[in-house]
């Protein structure tokens, strides 16, 4: 058990029969009344975000999440196949389980598979990935100084707003948490 006063971003807890990751939290001490902790939690099974308020000092169960390094192999219909890099066991995940992460997955990419007891609850990507631009408008000479952006489609189908100097065939570094352009590789 862990006190809500010890909440940290990224902490995984069990509340109301679900497994949640703390996305954001705020300790509130009103002038009148008892202190409380306002939190924003992400359900690791469904991806839904919920705001929940706890009384200060309340205890919640900490969820023990194990991670395994696995390699993404291929898509088989709406199933995606991953291989354990040590035991060579294969694991299939449904498209709905990894909907957000699909935009960043490339074949042979190493990812962290999150397991709760024996249940696979999702994957954790690296902070950034390198994706190749397959479609974008050509930049016009002189546009690099203006600081604007244009849309670019990557090899995974993700559309990223990029600076005008980025061309088709360039490799981009993309932030996996929000899908934003970081730099050229």
From Swiss-Prot:
MF-aspect GO terms: translation elongation factor activity
Keyword field contains GTP-binding: no
Pfam family, one: Elong-fact-P_C
Primary location: cytoplasm
Localization per record: Cytoplasm
GO biological process, one term: peptide biosynthetic process
GO cellular component, one term: cytoplasm
SUPFAM superfamilies found in the cross-reference section: Nucleic acid-binding proteins, Translation proteins SH3-like domain
Pathway per the UniProt entry: Protein biosynthesis; polypeptide chain elongation
Superkingdom of origin organism: Bacteria
InterPro entries listed in its UniProt record: Elong-fact-P_C, NA-bd_OB-fold, Rib_uL2_dom2, Transl_elong_fac_P/YeiP, Transl_elong_KOW-like, Transl_elong_P/YeiP_cen, Transl_elong_P/YeiP_CS, Transl_elongation_fac_P
Keywords assigned: Cytoplasm, Elongation factor, Protein biosynthesis
UniProt family annotation: Belongs to the elongation factor P family.
Protein purpose: Involved in peptide bond synthesis. Stimulates efficient translation and peptide-bond synthesis on native or reconstituted 70S ribosomes in vitro. Probably functions indirectly by altering the affinity of the ribosome for aminoacyl-tRNA, thus increasing their reactivity as acceptors for peptidyl transferase.
Matching PANTHER family: ELONGATION FACTOR P, ELONGATION FACTOR P (EF-P) FAMILY PROTEIN
Name of the protein in question: Elongation factor P
């Amino acid at each position: 058990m862990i006190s809500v006063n010890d909440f940290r971003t990224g902490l995984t807890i069990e509340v109301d029969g679900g497994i949640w990751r703390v996305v954001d939290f705020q300790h509130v001490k009103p002038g009148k009344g008892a202190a409380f902790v306002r939190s924003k939690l992400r359900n690791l099974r469904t991806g839904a975000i919920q705001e929940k308020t706890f009384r200060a000092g309340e205890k919640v169960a900490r969820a023990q999440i194990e991670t395994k390094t696995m390699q993404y192999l291929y898509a088989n219909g709406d199933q995606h196949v991953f291989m354990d890099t040590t035991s060579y066991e294969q694991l299939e995940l449904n498209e709905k389980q990894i909907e957000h992460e699909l935009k960043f997955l490339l074949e042979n990419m190493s990812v962290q598979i999150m397991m709760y007891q024996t249940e696979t609850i999702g994957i954790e990507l690296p902070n950034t990935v390198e994706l190749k631009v397959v479609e974008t408008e050509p930049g016009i000479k002189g546009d690099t100084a203006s600081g604007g952006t244009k849309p670019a489609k990557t090899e995974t189908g993700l559309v990223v707003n990029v600076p005008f100097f980025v061309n088709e065939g360039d490799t981009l570094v993309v932030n996996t948490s929000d899908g934003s352009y970081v730099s050229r590789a």
